[in-house]
Amino acid sequence: MRFFLSFFIIFISSVLFSFGIPNEILNFGSAIAGFSGLVLVYYALLNCGSHKRAAFLYGFFVSFVHLMSSFWLAFFEDFAIFTLGASTLAYFFIAMPFGFLLYHSLQKRENLRPFFFAAIWLLWEFAKSTGFLAYPWGTAPMICFNLKPFIQFVDITGVWGLSFIVPLIAACLGEALQTYAYSANSKAFFKGLTEIKSPLIFTAFLVLIINIYGITILSIEMKPATFLNTVIVQQNTDPWDNSQFEENIKTSQALSRKAIFSANKKPDLIVWSESSLIVPYKDNEDFYGILPYDDPFTRFLADTDTPIIVGSPYIDGKKQYNAAYLLSPEGKILDIYSKIQLVPFAEYIPFIDNPLVVRFFDKLVGFSSGWNPGTEYKVFGIKNSEGKTVNFTVPICFEDAFPAVCLNLHNAGSEVLINITNDSWSKTKSAEYQHFVVAHFRAIELRTTLVRSTNSGYSVVVDPKGKIISDMPLFEAESVYTEVPVYGHKKTFYASYKDWLPIMMFLILIFNIFLEKRRAKTARF
């Protein structure tokens, strides 16, 4: 196949896969578009003709999907040069070695190459979603939101199971497309299919088992151990606008009172979003005792007589943290959790103690400070209206997109994940829904309830099967009083054994490389 044709197919596949991910037209994406895009990726790489071409084509695919689906990163104020520009360029080069490996996997026997292709794809998505530079967007699981029975098995494998089975299905369909393209007639096509029947039958059987498992899980009724009556506030204001500081707090207070009044019932907990109090609450309690002037924050707490989760900076000596506070109705700090997984180069700049790094960032974006990463996986606890203690954790912003962060928070003893987020800067529906889709897998992986309180969307409550219990429209000032089901703390297979699947796939590939080298060495003698 000529390079131009391969490039054109990769371009089409990038567009299709981007439509598979939640976007401005299809709020929750399209599995059909996503799978179609992956089939074309397989077909293009299979026929591109060389490792170098495959590396370039896959680098283009990854970077272009990133650019199309995460274009809203350009709205991250002063950081667009990093969040969109540098990241797009970086993904092109980082993905190239995986393109090389994918092409290498396609040189194996027809019956084996779909499995090796899927294994390498899984390792790419694992690498992309892990570590300081991690960004778990633009991945295969994101096209599967509407396939509820199909995604339930992530409580065994984590989302890595989807990162394997989705490209495996696409690879099998790609093999069928390859057979069709090189068949003179239907008889030759069906004869060709018999030559690749092993991966086709195995994959079909695996998909059947996965769906039977999912249907079974969805049919089992889960009874909550108790409920946490929660007011979720979506103030739809910009916390970065210092001129609106008081108005933002007053809006959040008014929305909280509105939800309580509508329910005519005292809540167990109020949840405000990330950065709702931009002046650090700790050491500034007196400040919040007089502001806002006509409705001070601490008086509001006393009026509602309810604990609150609220996002506010936390300063400890010279270190600053993006934090979530649990405050009592009296305004006392009951506990603080500091965000661990920070946005690279936006919230956290590595080696910032180095004068050269300071000068570089001062020159480039006009400042060189940021948050420090937290170090402790905290679990908060309060008593609900039934007198039962409910333990929960508060991943901040895009921490709910990271399996490892939420898994460690859950394993610390959490019964509910309560995420607080500020995504208003994105200004797009697709950003809000993408974040939600990535995050909702945590509920299924850990079989726990997920609550998301955001300042503009998507504020939602998700049950342990990924079903939406309650939500609010995007970019509207709104609040809701909801009974959050609490199912008690338990560990799923994935919570117990963590990232066992990518580790196993990595070891299999290393063993295969060892065998290849051994065979090559034997063949020379």
Swiss-Prot record:
Molecular function via GO: N-acyltransferase activity
Positions of the catalytic residues: E274, K339, C397
Xref: Gene3D superfamilies: Carbon-nitrogen hydrolase
Family matches, as Pfam families: CN_hydrolase, LNT_N
Record field: transmembrane: 25-45, 56-76, 81-101, 115-135, 153-173, 200-220, 495-515
Metabolic or biological pathway: Protein modification; lipoprotein biosynthesis (N-acyl transfer)
Entry's Gene Ontology cellular component terms: plasma membrane
Enzyme type, top EC level: transferase
InterPro entries reported in the protein's UniProt record: Apolipo_AcylTrfase, C-N_Hydrolase, C-N_Hydrolase_sf, LNT_N
Occurrences of domain CN hydrolase (ranges): 228-486
Entry's EC annotation: 2.3.1.269
Subcellular location: Cell inner membrane
Membrane topology, from the record: Multi-pass membrane protein
Keywords per UniProt: Acyltransferase, Cell inner membrane, Cell membrane, Membrane, Transferase, Transmembrane, Transmembrane helix
GO biological process: lipoprotein biosynthetic process
Family membership: Belongs to the CN hydrolase family. Apolipoprotein N-acyltransferase subfamily.
Function: Catalyzes the phospholipid dependent N-acylation of the N-terminal cysteine of apolipoprotein, the last step in lipoprotein maturation.
Name of the protein this chain belongs to: Apolipoprotein N-acyltransferase 2
Provenance organism: Treponema denticola (strain ATCC 35405 / DSM 14222 / CIP 103919 / JCM 8153 / KCTC 15104)
Origin organism lineage: Bacteria, Pseudomonadati, Spirochaetota, Spirochaetia, Spirochaetales
